[in-house]
Swiss-Prot record:
Species assigned in the record: Rattus norvegicus
In-chain residues carrying the UniProt-annotated modification N-acetylalanine: 2
Name recorded for this polypeptide: Heat shock 70 kDa protein 1A
Residues that bear Phosphoserine: 631, 633
Modified residues (N6,N6-dimethyllysine): 561
Function: Molecular chaperone implicated in a wide variety of cellular processes, including protection of the proteome from stress, folding and transport of newly synthesized polypeptides, activation of proteolysis of misfolded proteins and the formation and dissociation of protein complexes. Plays a pivotal role in the protein quality control system, ensuring the correct folding of proteins, the re-folding of misfolded proteins and controlling the targeting of proteins for subsequent degradation. This is achieved through cycles of ATP binding, ATP hydrolysis and ADP release, mediated by co-chaperones.
Region (Disordered): 618-641
GO biological process, one term: negative regulation of release of cytochrome c from mitochondria
Region (Nucleotide-binding domain (NBD)): 2-386
PROSITE patterns, per database record: HSP70_1, HSP70_2, HSP70_3
NCBIfam families: PRK00290.1
Lineage: Eukaryota, Metazoa, Chordata, Craniata, Vertebrata
PTM field: In response to cellular stress, acetylated at Lys-77 by NA110 and then gradually deacetylated by HDAC4 at later stages. Acetylation enhances its chaperone activity and also determines whether it will function as a chaperone for protein refolding or degradation by controlling its binding to co-chaperones HOPX and STUB1. The acetylated form and the non-acetylated form bind to HOPX and STUB1 respectively. Acetylation also protects cells against various types of cellular stress.
Length: 641
């Protein structure tokens, strides 16, 4: 039976991270490469699907079919200006499917297209597997984090991605709230504290102000830029070096996707180096038309290239302070989250803005969000550990929610930054005499007129008895649950007739059937990946067996113990298999197993003949030994089942 462990997943734009709360503390779990964060990358090749480090490592060779930044697409429409501007930067293709963006790739020789939810679900599956490998049992319950800025549609789509990955999503929580939980556990001082969380990650930037009082977290304000992060700093470096290459070599590499990709990888590495050193060097062999590109960059130059971006991080800080109605002197703690907060200049700007206040860096910035999500998961699973017992979590609505009233005016029922879950009711009436029905149009946004806000959904309440304008009483209730999902109900008080809508977003929400189909496809892909792994294992087993046999009979210590005829027989057969392998790398598992058996039939009698009564193998012992016979000492090779 699956143990009741729940995990916390930080599903990032560029990197993801998973943690679990057990034995009274949080463990951030390393992946099979030993990394505690995993790239949010999925790659499709002629033979397989790769997720995480394996996908990111081959991106230069396969840029068109390596998908990243799915978080920038999730829950958005194709026509969204953000999607349109991002598409210019991506090497993979995004296509329009009924105003939903889909990523188009070539997988196993055919064109396939995937919704952003499917790509994100593949990353979530990877995170789930990382946790399962560490815990040693299946895991289904998870808390997943999203930027505080995400609207309802983006939250829903993230939840769908979790479902497709086979997870039971206990809750979607804001990243800064998660970081605050991590922080709240680390320090339980008494009295109310105002905390500003500065989260500059690979793709998004969030500033949040929370008050923590006796284990209760309340989000006071959120601000940020959904499009600022480490990748933007990488882009500045890339442009800088593209220009330098032009100056030095009179060639423009910007149209060559592979060269740009290799340059970008080197830039990311240089950027990380510059957080701890004042200079970094780039060495890229044969970058373009056989030209090696060796160069270096100083920290000062990097800061100059990104100065406007770095300075720009302070605007959302000021906005959040205004929204929270706090002065900067009233902030008790500054918390850094996200890998990009390791950049010394970013730290200095923030520190100077707060008049030299110390920054809190005690939490590893890459891991803080997953850490908090893991704690929240433990709370929701009813963990009785005293570390989490007294923690209460209040989240907020990122945008005001309301409906359209006469003249296209936005009437907000739930104000931005209201603590959720929450329920608000207001009474409306008709605009004209004998009006038979009302159209309830639900919007999110801060502008006075609905045309400038975002329509979430609409429904009609009909059958209102004829009456003069202003007489009927229509009671409208907005109810947001802890996941930020909205139910709107309208009731005619005279008849008791009601109608409602659950805003799980007409715009871009996947249907039950689509999710079901994607869950099944995800299972199928997983099975295909498994088949591929077995195939490769069988191929490798055959290859090593052939080479082992070859080196065994060529061993100098065997001179005179094996007849030339036998030796030739083994060598010829091994050579035949090795040649066959070279031209049949894509054969099925069964073919490899069959070839292996064929080779064993030739080799085993000869090799075991050598061992009859010969004791242990001679110098340089064989990498293989007949399954039967032999003295039982020396290495054996197992049949691959």
């Amino acid at each position: 039976m699956a143990k009741k462990t729940a995990i916390g997943i930080d599903l990032g734009t560029t990197y993801s991270c998973v943690g679990v709360f057990q034995h009274g503390k949080v463990e951030i779990i390393a992946n099979d490469q030993g990394n505690r964060t995993t790239p949010s990358y999925v790659a499709f090749t002629d033979t397989e699907r790769l997720i995480g480090d394996a996908a990111k490592n081959q991106v230069a060779l396969n840029p068109q079919n390596t998908v990243f930044d799915a978080k920038r697409l999730i829950g958005r429409k194709f026509g969204d200006p953000v999607v349109q501007s991002d598409m210019k930067h991506w090497p993979f293709q995004v296509v329009n499917d009924g105003d939903k963006p889909k990523v188009q790739v070539n997988y196993k020789g055919e064109n396939r297209s995937f919704y952003p939810e499917e790509i994100s679900s593949m990353v979530l599956t990877k995170m789930k597997e990382i946790a399962e490998a560490y815990l040693g049992h299946p895991v289904t319950n998870a808390v997943i984090t999203v930027p505080a800025y995400f609207n309802d549609s983006q939250r829903q789509a993230t939840k769908d991605a979790g479902v497709i990955a086979g997870l039971n999503v206990l809750r979607i929580i804001n990243e800064p709230t998660a970081a605050a939980i991590a922080y709240g556990l680390d320090r339980t001082g008494k009295g109310e504290r105002n905390v500003l969380i500065f989260d500059l990650g690979g793709g998004t930037f969030d500033v949040s102000i929370l008050t923590i009082d006796d284990g209760i977290f309340e989000v006071k304000a959120t601000a940020g830029d959904t499009h600022l992060g480490g990748e933007d700093f990488d882009n500045r470096l890339v442009s800088h070096f593209v220009e330098e290459f032009k100056r030095k070599h009179k060639k423009d590499i910007s149209q060559n996707k592979r060269a740009v990709r290799r340059l970008r990888t080197a830039c990311e590495r240089a950027k990380r180096t510059l957080s701890s050193s004042t200079q970094a060097s780039l060495e890229i062999d044969s970058l373009f038309e056989g030209i090696d590109f060796y160069t270096s960059i100083t920290r000062a130059r990097f800061e100059e290239l990104c100065s406007d971006l770095f300075r720009g991080t302070l605007e959302p800080v000021e906005k959040a302070l205004r929204d929270a109605k706090l002065d900067k002197a009233q902030i008790h703690d500054l918390v850094l989250v996200g890998g990009s907060t390791r950049i010394p200049k970013v730290q200095k700007l923030l520190q100077d803005f707060f008049n030299g206040r110390d920054l809190n860096k005690s939490i590893n910035p890459d891991e803080a969000v997953a850490y908090g999500a893991a704690v929240q998961a433990a709370i929701l699973m009813g963990d009785k550990s005293e570390n989490v017992q007294d923690l209460l979590l209040l989240d907020v609505a990122p945008l005001s929610l309301g409906l359209e009233t006469a003249g296209g005016v936005m009437t907000a029922l739930i104000k931005r930054n209201s603590t959720i879950p929450t329920k608000q009711t207001q009474t409306f009436t008709t605009y004209s005499d004998n009006q038979p029905g009302v159209l309830i149009q639900v919007y999110e946004g801060e502008r006075a007129m609905t045309r400038d806000n975002n329509l979430l959904g609409r429904f009609e309440l009909s059958g209102i008895p004829p009456a003069p304008r202003g007489v009927p009483q229509i009671e409208v209730t907005f109810d947001i649950d802890a996941n930020g999902i909205l139910n709107v109900t309208a009731t005619d008080k005279s008849t008791g007739k009601a109608n409602k809508i659950t805003i799980t977003n007409d715009k871009g929400r996947l249907s039950k059937e689509e999710i079901e189909r994607m869950v099944q496809e995800a299972e199928r892909y997983k099975a295909e990946d498994e088949v591929q792994r077995e195939r490769v294992a069988a191929k490798n087993a055959l290859e090593s067996y052939a080479f082992n046999m070859k080196s065994a009979v060529e061993d100098e210590g065997l001179k005179g113990k094996i007849s030339e005829a036998d030796k030739k027989k083994v060598l010829d057969k091994c050579q035949e298999v090795i040649s066959w392998l070279d031209s049949n790398t894509l054969a099925e598992k069964e073919e490899f197993v069959h070839k292996r058996e064929e080779l064993e039939r030739v080799c085993n009698p000869i090799i075991s003949g050598l061992y009859q009564g010969a004791g242990a193998p001679g110098a340089g012992g064989f990498g293989a030994q007949a399954p039967k016979g032999g003295s039982g000492s020396g290495p054996t090779i197992e049949e691959v089942d």
